[in-house]
Amino acid sequence: MKLLVVGGGGREHAIIKSLKKNPNVTEIFALPGNGGIAADAVCVPIGATEIDKIVAFAQEQKIDYAVVAPDDPLVLGCVDALEASKIPCFGPRARAAIIEGSKVFSKNLMKKYGIPTAQYEVFDDMAAALAYLDTAPIPTVIKADGLALGKGVIIAQTRDEAKAAVRDMMENHVFGKSGDHVVIEEFLTGPEVSVLAFTDGKVVKPMVSSMDHKRAGDGDTGLNTGGMGTVAPNPYYTPAIAQRCMEEIFLPTVAAMNSEDRTFQGCLYFGLMLTPDGPKVIEYNCRFGDPETQVVLPLLESDLLTVMQATTNGTLADTEVRFSDKYACCVITASAGYPVSYQKGYEITMTPEAAAHTYVAGAKLEGGKLLTSGGRVTGTTAVADSLADAIQEAYRLASGVQFENAYRRSDIGQRALQA
C-alpha cells in the first residue's frame, strides 16, 4: 500500500513511524515532511494547505490511503477534496472540522446539547466586549474564534490584561480574521487532561489519556507554547472519570455533530478540565494533538492503519483498539528563546539510541546535515513499566539530542508524579 501523510511536524513523524509497522505498507509520502521525517518517508515539498497540489500528487502516485494530520488543511477541506478524487483518507471533512476551526461554533454546540463547558459570552463588537470586561469575574479567559496556531487563548489575571487581549485580537488583528469574533469565558480550575479518541461518527474509542505541559518554563512559568512535553496515562483520569466523560461528553459530542449534519470521522481531541463540578470541555481539536501523539501512539498495541481505515469505513465498532498498560513520557527539545524569537540553522546531532526514540519537528536537511528550522525541534519518547522510569529514561535519551542553544524543561511529568 502507498500512503500519504499531510503535515510536517513531530506529530506526523510519530504517525508515520506507527504506520510503518504495518507489513502491507510499501511506501509513505510526507507532504511536506521535514528533515527528520525524511529518514522514514519520502518528503515532497508541497505545503499542507496546497490542497489542489496535494490531490494532484495523490492521483499521480495512485495513493491507496491518505492521513491529513494538521488543523489548517482539515478546516480548509483537504479530506473533502481527496475523497472527491476517490482517495480514501483519515480525518474529518470541513463541515466537521469546524469543531476546532471555530470556537464560537463549538461553544454554541455544547450549550445547545448540554455538554459541560465553561460559561461564556461571544462578541463581534470590540466596544461591547470591553464593556462586558468592566464587570466580568477575573481571572477570565479570552479566546480568538478561529485557528491561531494554538496561541489564540489568553488567561487574563487582571481587567487590563483582558482588555489588552481583546484589543490585540479585534483591533490589532494579531490573529488576522481568527480574532474578528472572540469568546470570553469563565476561568475553570482543576487538573487538565487530554484525551484523543478515534470515532467513525457512531462509536468512540478513546486512546490512552495524557498530560501536556504548555508553559515554556519549569514550574509551569513563562509563555504558552505548543507543548514542551507530555506523559501518558494521566493519573488524574481515573476509570470513574473516564466513564463519566464517555457518557456526558464523548458520545454526546459525536451525537450532536450528527444532529447538525456534521458527522465527525477521524481523531477527535478532547481538552478537559476536571473541575470540582465534574469534567468540562476546555477545547475540541479535530486532529491528533502535538505532542500528545508522541506518547499515545508508542503505547498503541493495535495496528494504527487498521484502526484508521475502520474509522473511515464506519466499522470501528468491530475493530479492537488496544493500548499497553505501560507509561510513556515525551520531552521536547526546543530552540532557546521559543516561543518568542530564536536562532535557526544549527546542526543537530543525535546518538543512534536517541534517534530511534525521537520524533523530529523543526528541522531541515541541508548538505546532508540536519539543521534546526523551528522552535520545537525534537520530541524524545520513552516507554517504561512506571511513570518515574519513563520520565527518567526520556530525559536520558533526550540528552543524546544536541544542538547549539538547545533548551528543555527539566520537570516534565513531575506534576503527574505528585498526583
Q: Residue ranges of each PLM-predicted region?
A:
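Short acidic-hydrophobic, aromatic-tinged amphipathic segments that line or gate anion-handling sites
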Residues: 43-49, 121-125, 156
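A conserved helix-loop-beta module that forms one wall/lid of the active-site cleft
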Residues: 90-152
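ATP-binding N-terminal substructure of ATP-dependent carboxylate-amine bond-forming enzymes
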Residues: 1-94
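Peripheral (often C-terminal) accessory segments that flank ATP-dependent C-N-forming ligase machineries
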Residues: 310-419
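Solvent-exposed alpha-helices and their adjacent loops that cap or buttress functional pockets
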Residues: 21, 36-37, 90, 112-114, ...
